[in-house]
Amino acid sequence: MTLKPMIRTTLRFAVALSALAMAFASTPSAAQTQGCNVVVQSDDALRYLPHAIEVPRTCKDFTVTLTHSGRLPVLAMGHNWVLSKQSDMAGVARTGMLAGAENHYVDPSDRRVIAHTKVIGGGQASSVSFAVSALQPGETYAFFCTFAGHSPVMQGSLVLQ
């Protein structure tokens, strides 16, 4: 390999690495809440942004608005936002699958579910509010999608501040 192609390859690598670093640097690790509200973004790539939410204990109620910026319809790539204790996540996801689409993949009688949105498709949004008093200091909470097979990769954490 001569010097010019090596320099060109090195420059391409450096540009790609810089772009990747900037993408991760601009991804928030914890949600910047607007008072007692947060917008959680989802898309066709099976992810939530942000991955972590901090709920101020001064809020009486907290509202989560789930948006889906993807293009696929609800039947192909639907998402919801479900909140439970971290320790209950697997069980809630399992019973949610059995509850089916007509129940937005959430068992309506499951007391482990603290809050959940409807299942939405590309271009849609859904909101849910819950009492902050339902959260316990020091407890670990998870939010996740209970649409078919999404919960193993589509999840995040929520803490009471």
Each language-model region and where it sits:
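Extracytoplasmic/periplasmic copper-protein system
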Residues: 32-43, 84-106, 148-161
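Bacterial N-terminal signal peptides that target proteins for export
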Residues: 2-16
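Extracellular/periplasmic metallocenter environments
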Residues: 115-161
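C-terminal segment of classical bacterial N-terminal signal peptides
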Residues: 20-29
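N-terminal edge beta-strand
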Residues: 34-61
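Short beta-strand and strand-turn-strand segments in soluble, beta-rich domains
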Residues: 103-115
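Short, solvent-exposed loop/turn elements at domain surfaces
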Residues: 46-50, 72-76, 90-92
